[in-house]
Regions:
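C-terminal segments of enzyme domains that contribute to small-molecule binding surfaces
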Residues: 86-89, 93-98, 102-103, 134-192
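A transmembrane-helix-recognition feature enriched in membrane-embedded lipid enzymes
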Residues: 1-35
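Structural signal for interior beta-strand "rungs" in well-ordered beta-sheet cores
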Residues: 32-139
């Protein structure tokens, strides 16, 4: 269905560019009915887009898709309803978007980036990055893991940190008490 959706899109986009807006929308709505893929005729799509198992894919009017991108089923390239003018995302070349991901807003997803299945992307993604989660966060750039303040596996334990601090204070107090006992035995009193 992805190939057929793109064939219909190319025709509806041609109509759209030639100011036959009503016919362009008719063709795109017919394509949505036939393929389950909704591509607005105003969207700009480069060469080599692959829509795999396309059912449920939605591509908004001001979306721009570069060359050789891959989009899986259930992906939305949409707006948030807060913006005017350019409302939809721009995908640079060689971007892959996993099943069910939502990329919402007028920002850029950099070249060679990957968006994980089910991610909700609301902010810019740099080139050569991998973004995951809801809301999406970048976890890899250029194949290297990115440190995250919200790493749920290695997040600092505040109770453990407090216990360590208290142990340190106890050790310091024990040293001071020992020093006081030593000084008292010698008959000297020293201010600490």
């Amino acid at each position: 269905s992805g190939l057929h959706a793109l064939i219909y899109y190319r025709f509806s986009h041609w109509l759209y560019r030639h100011h036959c807006l009503f016919l362009a929308r008719m063709v795109s709505q017919f394509a949505r009915f036939m393929t389950g893929v909704e591509i607005h005729p105003g969207a700009t799509i480069g060469r080599g887009l692959f829509i795999d198992h396309g059912s449920g894919v939605v591509i908004g009017e001001t979306a721009i898709i570069g060359d050789n991108c891959t989009i899986y089923q259930g992906v939305t390239l949409g707006g948030t309803g807060k913006d005017h003018g350019k409302r939809h995302p721009t995908l640079e070349d060689n971007v892959l978007i996993g099943s069910g991901a939502k990329v919402l807003g007028p920002f850029t997803v950099g070249a060679n980036s990957r968006i994980a299945a089910g991610a909700v992307v609301l902010d810019e993604v740099p080139p050569n990055a991998t973004a995951v989660g809801v809301p999406a966060r970048v976890v890899r750039v250029n194949g290297r893991k990115v440190d995250s303040d919200m790493d749920q596996v290695h997040i600092p334990d505040p109770v453990s940190q407090e216990l360590c601090r208290l142990r340190g204070m106890i050790e310091q107090l024990e040293k001071e008490v020992k020093l006081l006992k030593t000084n008292k035995g010698e008959g000297q009193h020293e201010d600490l």
